[in-house]
Amino acid sequence: MSKYTVKRASVLCIFGIGLFVPATGTFACGLLLVLGFWVLFFSSLLARFLSQFFMRTRSAPLFEVCLTLSATIMYDNLIQGFFPLVRMMLCPYLFITALSRTLDLCLTAYDADAESLECVGVFGIMIAGISLVRELVAFGCVSLPAPSGFLRIISFPPSNVIRFAATGAGTLISCGIVLWIFRSAGNDHTPSLRSEW
C-alpha cells in the first residue's frame, strides 16, 4: 500500500470520528462501539474471503452485505443480553455503521488499497481514547459496561475549568485541533490537502 493511500485513509478516519461524538460520552460506550466496529470490519473480510472460493463474482457483494448485516444484528443482540442499558445508547450507531458499509459496497467499486488494518486500528484507538478522556474530564471517572448500566472503576472530582472539552462541541473542536496538528506535522513530507483530493 502506498504512503499516499495510508495518509488519506488516516485523514478519513479522523473526519469519521465526528459522526460518533454523541456515542462516546463514556468509556463503556466507546469500548463497545470499537468492538462493534471491529466485528463489522472482520465479518466483511471473512465474507470476501469466503466469496473468493465458493461464490461467483457477481454474487460476492450481496453475500458480503448479508454477512455484514447478520454480524451486526448478532452483536447488537449480544449487547442487549449482557448490557441492555448501554445497548439503548449504542444501537443507532451500530446500524448506521453497518448501513454505511452496505451503501459503500452497493454504490462504489471495491478498491483493495482503500482499506487497511492501520486505518481501522487508528480509528478504534482514537474512538476509545476520546471516550476515555471525555469521561475523565466531564465526570471524573472511568466506567465499564455492566448489566445494570455502568461500573465505575476510577472516580475523582472533575475539573469545572476544562469540562467544556468533554461536551459534544468541545470534542469536535478537539478533533479539529488534532486534525490541524496531524496535517501540520506532515506538510514537509506530503502534498497539500487540496492536492490529495
Curated annotation (Swiss-Prot):
It is found in: Cell membrane. It comes from Treponema pallidum (strain Nichols). It is a multi-pass membrane protein. Its main location: membrane. The keyword Cell membrane applies. It comes from the Bacteria. Keywords: Cell membrane, Membrane, Transmembrane, Transmembrane helix. Signal peptide: none annotated. This is Uncharacterized protein TP_0149. GO terms for cellular component: plasma membrane. The keyword Ribonucleoprotein does not apply. The chain crosses the membrane at residues 12-41, 78-100, 120-142, 162-184.
